[in-house]
C-alpha cells in the first residue's frame, strides 16, 4: 500500500497480478505432464563445496579471483544452453546428469577422483577447470605435481600456472579463433597431442595447451585450463562438450532464462532488450507474449 493506506503500491500491484496468474495456471495444470526428453538429455550438474570456497578465498593468488563469480560463470553458460542445471555436493549421485562441471574444485581425495572416473567410464561428460585437484582435504598441495590427482582423468600434466596483471592480455587460439585471457593460465601438456584443443599463442606461454580433452570408457573429460573475462572461450569449449556428446543446445543471450516445471515452460527476461521467443507450432501461450519484454514473463505449454 501507499501512504494513504488504500492505493496499491507497485509491489501490491505485482502481488495481485501474480495471484491472478496463478489461478490461470491452475486451470490448465496437468499433473501427468512428462519431463521433456530434450531437457533430460541436457541435464547438467555443478559441484559445490564450502571447504573449496574457504580454501580458494584465503590465498586468492590474484586480485582478479572471485570463487563465487567463477562458479556462476559456468552456471550461466550452462543455462544459456537451455540445460537444466542443479548444484550438487560431491557426495550426491551423478548418474542422471549428462554433463558434470567441477569449477575450481580445489580440495580432492582419491575417493572423489575415483567417483569422477567411474562417472566418465559409464558415459558421463566431466568438465574440470583451473584450480581443481590442487590440494588434499587438509589444504596441502599434492607432491605429485600441480593438480596431480586429476592427471589420470585428463591424460595430461600441468607444468606451471601464471596470472597476468589486470591491464595485460594474453592470447589463446582455439578452432581458428583467437581469444583474450589474463586471469589465470595453466600450462598443460597432453600425453596425446591430438587431445590438445586450445593453445596459448604469445608471450612465454606460446605453444602450451590451454584446453585438453580425454575419452575414458563411454565418456569424456575436458580440462579448461584458462580463465577469461569475456567467457567467450569457455562458452565455445563448453558448447563443443555438449555437441560431441550428441546433446543439442540453445543459444540464449545474457539475461534470458527458459525453464520447464510441472508441465509449463517459463521464460523470463532480465536484460534491457526485447527477445523474440522461438516457440514450436504446438505451443499454446498461457501468460505473456511471443515477444519477451524486459522484466517480462511468458508461460506456455506444448
Where are these regions (language model features)?
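Anion (oxyanion) recognition and catalysis
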Residues: 1, 79, 120-121
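Hydrophobic targeting/anchoring helices
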Residues: 1-73, 160-165, 169-182, 197-201, ...
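Short hydrophobic alpha-helical runs that function as membrane-insertion/retention elements
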Residues: 6-8, 86-87, 127-128
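Extracellular/periplasmic catalytic domains that process cell-envelope and extracellular macromolecules
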Residues: 37-41, 94, 121, 215-216
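A short, well-structured beta->alpha microelement
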Residues: 74-94
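Loop/turn elements at helix/coil->beta-strand transitions in domains of secreted/extracellular proteins
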Residues: 81-85, 96-98, 122-126, 219
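Active-site and adjacent substrate-binding regions of carbohydrate-active enzymes
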Residues: 92-106
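A conserved amphipathic helix/loop scaffold
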Residues: 104-302
